[in-house]
Amino acid sequence: MENRGNFGSKLGVILATAGSAVGLGNIWRFPYMTGQNGGAAFILIYFVCIILLGLPGMLSEFIIGRHGASNAARAYKVLAGGKAWAFMGYMGAICSMIILGFYAVVAGWCLQYLYASIIGQVHGDAEFVKNYFVTFSSDPIQPVIWTIVFILLTHFVVVRGVRNGIEKASKILMPLLFILLLVIVVASCSLPGAGKGIEFLLKPDFSKVDENVLLEALGQAFFSLSLGTACLCTYASYFTRQTNLVKSASQIVIIDTVIAILAGLMIFPAAFSVGVNPDSGPSLIFITLPNVFNEAFAGMPAVGYVISILFYALLVLAALTSTISMHEIGTACFYEELKISRKSGAWIETIICCVIGVFCSLSQGAVPELSLFGKDFLTCCDNFTAQLLMPLGAFLTCLFLGWYVPKKLVHDEFTNNDTLKGRLFPVFLFMIRFVTPACIFLIFLHQFGVL
């Protein structure tokens, strides 16, 4: 079996792992939730949830991954001293494979819209923009092609390995993503009436805070950091023994949150400048925002044209940094467990994800019969991973590390064998034994409508 390699620099660790967390959800979900749930009040609650749930969950996967120094399934075997917990790694790999399949569909739409923006296809009135999306997404050919193209883009990064593929790509994609985001934020905040959008996003309104807002903040903290997918565990297996896990996790959380807030500053000022109250999800980025950009920059068509291109380029980059990490989970499992080359393992992962992606794409209108329990196949995949596999994986990870793995082993990883101060270790252990699992259980109940 070939040498698995590791990250070559601290910057590579931070940018690659932050890239796995930064994705389309930062753009189409966090800003909307912040604006609707009290602005800065929601952000403060979100930070608390990150401390209670996000950081302990991330550190748990980091510890398992770095100590195991292998794919997720084998990492759990190493810490458990046998195969009893190996299913956790396999469950994470399956979860990420399913997510990559349907995520690539939406990422493929972003590629199409980037191309359409370049050739000027998405400029028109509101009805035209809406019909364009409905017609395109239900087409049996084009979305499938773009889905496969996006998965292949991901494949050709992952197949090059950790340093030459994942790390090198992250060092290019993440700074470029940040620059594009800043450019659009400046343009958006410069529009007449943009101040109302900034106020809507950032002005604290504690009157909106209730138990549902608390649960929404918990859920956002959980899903934003890719917990429960074995992604963080897999990336941590490429960390060096000198990597400060606590510091790295804190930096990644800050980057993820800053980008999400900047995404809000990109969306709301432009939307409020033309009197639009944005929604969330795919309709936000494929219907609402094209209309907003068309109307907001109507007096400056050249600027509007450039902003549209930059926006969809931004979405493609955000999606790609996430899909790279998802692909790597399965690739590592395949080539290490089957004792084959990385190239062969990557192709197995790519083919499986392409099959899932094709079914998800066709279920969006071209073949409506592709459904389960009254929901299209893409939605079923989304619900199965978000409502079951991810919360279950993260919950069991906390129990595994908090109660099953020897305390000294966890302490040694937390402190880099006592070369770092371990004052926060008792707090971390208490969190993953009691607080974080309780938070995940609340998310699980909320997902199923019990709370």
Enumerate the language-model features and the residues they cover:
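Loop-to-transmembrane helix boundary motifs in multi-pass membrane proteins
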Residues: N6, G12, S20, V144-I145, ...
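Membrane-interface "cap" regions at the ends of multi-pass membrane proteins
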Residues: M1-W28, G57-F62, R66-L79, K83-Y90, ...
